């Protein structure tokens, strides 16, 4: 188990990486995902990367075991703590 997991990889697979990261984190651990706003392209309804980033953000937001925060710095950074 890890205290911190940082994800900065191909955006299409972010949902899968998030699941892997969650399982690797210990309780109280921190997850960090880079490029979550994708230079503002995250709102593009047809872009594969944008769709995957929105799906990842929704997964994190809706998981009651996580306490997330989205920082709108440059490309966006999502940080969460694994609560349970």
Language-model-detected regions and their locations in the chain:
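C-terminal substrate-binding/active-site "lid" region of AdoMet-derived donor-dependent transferases
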Residues: 13-84
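A short acidic, Gly/Pro-enriched loop at the edge of an enzyme's catalytic core
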Residues: 1-5
